[in-house]
A protein has these predicted regions:
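Surface-exposed, short loops/turns at beta-strand junctions within beta-sandwich domains
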Residues: 78-87
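Beta-strand-rich structural segments
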Residues: 19-39
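Short strand-edge motifs at loop-to-beta-strand transitions and within beta-strands
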Residues: 73-77
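Solvent-exposed strand-loop boundary residues in beta-sheet-rich modules
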Residues: 34, 57-59, 96-98
Length: 109
């Protein structure tokens, strides 16, 4: 068997920034390490099935009710109501990406 290693691709590391955090929603902007400060390469096209939300404080899964991407790479994530000061963890899975930094970056309600 012959393999051309020049055809192999590594995973793109992804970071997250959270904003508009509330008891039922938050926005997540997802960027790779590529591009520039003014024109970063964003992670686009994710759907609800790519994401899971977990309440670290209560040790319980949180139901995501809807996800909308607008603008590109920024996701409005709506979920079942959570208690103020609870800590949430967003986990994303998508081929070609490494979301370890996103998972480590928790969200405080």
């Amino acid at each position: 068997m012959s393999t051309d290693i020049s055809l192999l691709n590594g995973l793109l590391d992804v970071t997250s920034t959270y904003s508009s955090i509330g008891q039922t929603s938050f926005k997540a902007t997802l960027k790779t390490q590529y591009g520039s400060f003014l024109n970063p390469v964003l992670v686009e096209g994710l759907v609800a099935g790519d994401m899971a939300l977990y309440n670290v404080t209560d040790s319980a899964s949180v139901t995501i009710t809807s996800i909308a991407e607008s603008p590109d790479g920024t996701y409005q994530i709506n979920f079942a109501s959570q208690t103020v000061a609870d800590v949430l963890r967003l986990t994303i899975t998508k081929d070609g990406y490494n979301f370890a930094a996103v998972t480590a970056n928790t969200i405080t309600i």
